[in-house]
Amino acid sequence: MSNPLHVHVPWRLLESTLPFLIDRGLQPEVAFQGPDLDRAPAASLDNVGRALGAAGLAVTVHAPFHDLNPGALEPLVAEATRRRFLQTLEAADRLGARLVVFHPGYERWKYGGRDHLWLEQALRFWPPFIDLASRQGCAMALENVFEREPPPLANLLAQLDSPFLGHCFDVGHWHLFCSLPVDEWFFALGSRTIHLHLHDNFGRADDHLPVGEGSIDFGALFGQVGALAARPSMTLEAHDRPALLRSLAGVAPFLVR
């Protein structure tokens, strides 16, 4: 069975972190900021992709998200988002990535209860990306961020209904923002869940603590994951090496079940 586990690595640190990743057999989820995509040389992306492939390590990618929104009503914001996401898929292709995580841009306070405004724009935005991703053989996953309930993401994914566009369940964001128990979230979106983001908090801030160091019930989460028809890949979103090592230890018992 293929290794499902990845670890968060910013693009700016990836080349210097490669020896550590290869030595430990850790697969990166490469996180890009917008300016990274303007500056990253194609040759560097190709070289890193080849090095990881030669080591037998798979790659996932996290797209930039600051100030971007694929459901934006403002055409200039939508165009900036389109440009960055196209750059992200190009970088992912050079790295040999087979999955890219995107933020959906939904914030209920922005739309004043008129979620259909965001949904209508998102339904127009994603089809060209689905076509491109299918040609690259690269899946895309929309991550829950501020969603209190599943319908915004569930409705979008159901209407687009593509095997190349699924859901990334971020357990830290769910614990912080969602009003539903994890089994109800998975009842709505489990069949479309293809990736997980794993980090911990106490329900007060997006702390990105190592797995097991906050108040999230990871046993309940992995109970839901174990019932899925296909096991999702997953990324530990630790933001420094000591936290990563503790998170690896924290998640290990759930990966051997």
How would you label these PLM feature ranges?
Residues 71-166:
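Active-site acidic/histidine proton-transfer and metal-coordination neighborhood
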Residues 48-66, 121-135, 218-225:
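Alpha-helix-loop-beta-strand connector modules within alpha/beta enzyme cores
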Residues 3-9, 28-30, 59-63, 100-102, ...:
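Hydrophobic faces of well-ordered beta-strands that scaffold small-molecule active sites
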Residues 42-47, 77-85, 115-126, 179-188, ...:
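Charged helix-capping and loop-helix junction motifs
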Residues 1-93, 256-257:
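N-terminal pre-domain/capping segments
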Residues 2-4, 15-22, 98, 150-165, ...:
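Histidine-acidic metal/acid-base catalytic patches
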Residues 65-69, 106-109, 200-205:
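Conserved radical SAM core fold
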Residues 8-16, 32-46, 69-72, 108-112, ...:
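Acidic-and-aromatic substrate-binding clefts and catalytic sites of carbohydrate-active enzymes
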